[in-house]
Amino acid sequence: MRKFQIFSKSSIAIIIVFLAACHAPVEWTNYGGNKANNHYSSLVQIDTNNVASLKKAWEYHTGDADEKTQIQVNPLIIDGVLYAVSPKLKLFALDAGSGKEIWVFNPAEPNSVSAKGNGYFSMNVCRGVSFYKNGKNDQRLFYSASGSLYCVNAVTGKPITSFGTDGKIDLHQDLGVDASNLYVASTTPGMIYKDLIIVGTRVAEEAAAAPGHIRAYDVHTGKMRWIFHTIPQPGEAGYESWDNKEAVSYTHLTLPTIYSV
C-alpha cells in the first residue's frame, strides 16, 4: 500500500483502503517510507487493473476538525499499528487492520499557538512522526506541536518524561537569540540517525523572525548535541563570504527556513 495524505481544512476522517488479499505486510517506518526517504513502496498488489474495485476497509474520525484546521499527516505503519496526528495535533495509534483506536496523546494545548499572542495556529500543521526503536522495550515517537518537540512511548501513548522537560523540548530555546515570542515550529518530521533526532525549523517569513537553524537532539535525554547555523557564525565555514559581518547579530533577521532534513 502506498502512502496517503489528506489536504482538507475540514477533514475529520482518515480512510484506509486495502486489497482483499494481501501478501506479507510491508511497513511504512519513516515519513519518506524507509531510511532512504524515497517515498516509494515496493507493493504491487494494487495497479491500474484492480484499483477501481477497491473498497473501504474502515474509517476513523479524529473528532477535532473545524473550519480553521487541516490535516497533512503521512502516517507510519509499524508492527500492525498506524501512527498519525489529528487536525488539532493529537497523536494517535490505531490497529492498522481494524481501525480500532489504541491510544490518543493530547499535548494539552487547545487552540495552541506557537508564538504567544499571535494567531499562528492555522500554520501549525504536523506532517508526520518519527519512530525510534532500541530493543523491544524502548520504542519512541517524536512529533512537533505548537513549537514543542514531544517524545511519546509508542506502546502506551504516554510522554517519556526523561526526555527534555516532562517529555518535550521547547523549540524556541537554543537558537542563540530570544525567540520566546516569535513563531517557531517544526512541521515536517525529524530524521532519526543513530541516537539523534535531527529537526528543521519553520519560522515566520517577515522581519520579526527567529533563526531557521537545524538542530540535533539526543533521543533519550532531549539534550541538544549540535546545531547548524543557516547563516554561518564567526569561525564557521562560509562566514568569510558574508560582506556584512554584523548580519549574524541581527535579532530579527529572517533566516532561511528549513522545513525538513
Give a label for each model feature.
Residues 2-12:
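Bacterial N-terminal signal peptides that target proteins for export
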Residues 25-66, 100-118, 158-179, 223-230, ...:
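Aromatic (tryptophan-biased) beta-strands that constitute blades/sheets of beta-rich domains
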Residues 44-47, 51-132, 143, 149-154, ...:
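N-terminal cofactor/phosphate-binding cores enriched in small/glycine residues
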Residues 79-80, 138-139, 195:
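Short coil/turn segments that connect the beta-strands within blades of beta-propeller domains
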Residues 115-117, 121-131, 145-149, 154-191, ...:
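Asp-box/WD-like beta-propeller blade repeats and closely related beta-sheet repeat scaffolds
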Residues 212-223:
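Beta-propeller blade signature
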Residues 251-257:
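Conserved small/polar residues in nucleotide/adenosyl-binding loops
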